UniProtKB/Swiss-Prot annotation:
NAD-binding protein involved in the addition of a carboxymethylaminomethyl (cmnm) group at the wobble position (U34) of certain tRNAs, forming tRNA-cmnm(5)s(2)U34. Its cofactor is FAD. InterPro entries: FAD/NAD-bd_sf, GIDA_C_N, MnmG, MnmG-rel, MnmG-rel_CS, MnmG_C, MnmG_C_subdom, MnmG_C_subdom_sf. This is tRNA uridine 5-carboxymethylaminomethyl modification enzyme MnmG. PROSITE patterns: GIDA_1, GIDA_2. It comes from the Bacteria. One of its GO terms (cellular component) is cytosol. SUPFAM superfamilies: FAD/NAD(P)-binding domain. Homodimer. Heterotetramer of two MnmE and two MnmG subunits. Pfam families: GIDA, GIDA_C_1st, SAM_GIDA_C.
Amino acid sequence: MLYPQDFDVIVVGGGHAGTEAALAAARMGSRTLLLTHNIETLGQMSCNPSIGGIGKGHLVKEVDALGGAMALATDEAGIQFRILNSSKGPAVRATRAQADRILYKAAIRRMLENQPNLWLFQQAVDDLMVEGDRVVGAVTQVGIRFRSRAVVLTAGTFLDGKIHVGLNNYAAGRAGDPPAVSLSARLKELQLPQGRLKTGTPPRIDGRSIDFSQCEEQPGDGMPGGVNEGAVPVFSFMGNAAMHPRQVPCWITHTNARTHEIIRSGFDRSPMFTGKIEGVGPRYCPSVEDKINRFADKESHQIFLEPEGLTTHEFYPNGISTSLPFDIQYDLVRSMRGLENAHILRPGYAIEYDYFDPRSLKSSFETRQIQGLFFAGQINGTTGYEEAAAQGLFAGINAALQCRGERAWVPARDEAYLGVLVDDLITKGVTEPYRMFTSRAEFRLQLREDNADMRLTDAGRRMGLVDDARWDAFSRKRDAVSRETERLKSTWVNPRNLPTVEAERVLGKAIEHEYNLFDLLRRPDVGYDALTTMDGGKYASEAVSRETLGELSAPVIEQVEIAAKYAGYIERQRDEVQRAAHFEKLRLPEDLDYMQVAALSIEVRQKLQKHRPETLGQASRISGVTPAAISLLMVHLKKGGFKGFAPQPADGVETVA
């Protein structure tokens, strides 16, 4: 049957990538259909019950700045919040939250059901409708054909998925869900380059069988005994602490020599060590057997016992992801302090699945082979809810823009972690599941959590992603930051008018000549609050008083203070950005035959011919392409007078072919 209504965008899959893709396209005005094998699992947290972390929290803030759902859903579902790296510089501070699985899923479902221009339909997709080199729709498992102008594929671990527990294995998309075998076969027919990856999850434990008196309590920020007692962090720029449910602690235990002995005894039945698993696992979230094998000299590993929610006794033991046989899982869990009588509710397992080489994507995440077909999430070789959500939002945006006949939106590496993520995937590809770290960004001082809205909300508004309420809140914050920064720069402190005792109290010593407040705030040991109490509050501002702006005040002050203290570093980084931008604006001819560029080595020619970079900047980041090779390529292009060798538009976006 051909469904009687046509759509602009079809999104296949209802995980973290799919939900953000569907919401983004619908917010932008596209008639959007979200196809999922089970409406009850929309927004499901398939693995760990947490959102955020180093690098990952930055992505969540960026998704939020563009009107996405993940941060707000986390504020509604978060049962513990922490600011990681709080004692370090602002560039690497990151928010992390434990989330109640049921509350999180409910929040996402509510947002989906209440979003205009968005339709939900429960059916697995078995096939794509392709005419020539363009996708025109999707076909479900019972033969319903939906026509659309673009399709965003966010299949997660479902593509030909296989679960392993010991030497036993079976086909599945995740525990309890069937795999997408037909869809995977169809994609292979389209000759899209693919491979296999794997990920894993730990056994779940009944909290009633845990002796918490033998474990170390880990309260969240704002909880009794935690950092900043009484002040619980907030994830969304539109969120507040009143949205949070009841806050609860996590707990810590450790593996020991007995645990490691048990794990080693199961190596001969491990699918990872016996070759049953072909896919490569995530380097930064290894299985416990991998950790014991690789770090044989380490006597103990920290294990975090994380609550799955407020209405369940289920706990997630973060740190013992495993595919070992269940008898080994049973013994290794019970070998740890506090878990001697633990009851396992669900066994741990590994899952391997198909992914498609992201180097075959355009920088909009549209496939090069099939027009209108976009990929996002684990299908691109990434791991993590946050990476998936960011990609889904990005692909949804560009699918909607293509339907409008507009240029793709591609943030640069100096504009967003999303830009770093996209560029890394399409230029470097993956050899293992990719996760985000702050260390992946060259310009991370500019890419902080606190300024994600300043970097992206304006672009989101222009594309139709940001509603009036968010835009009004953002505009008030932006204007307040600007006004207060200017006030500090134009307010001068004269040593003749400042009592020495006050100067010593706030500044550490008397001043010898006139300074403006902004320059005084640049001093490492001078805080904003102390500065505004100087000389009886004479230098305080009404514009950012807590009485005037309420909760908006803290973010405003934070922005102003960071801008002052890191002004020199930020300015130097901006200079680096400008130098790098030259290459990013130079587009490479689409039809260039790199094998004919005689000045380049065979290796470089082969890599450029395979990857087909869109800009000189992308070419420079391909592994093995040296700065000398880039210089030679520039000479070749200039001598040849190639028409395509021209600057991109000033806003850094590219034309969708």
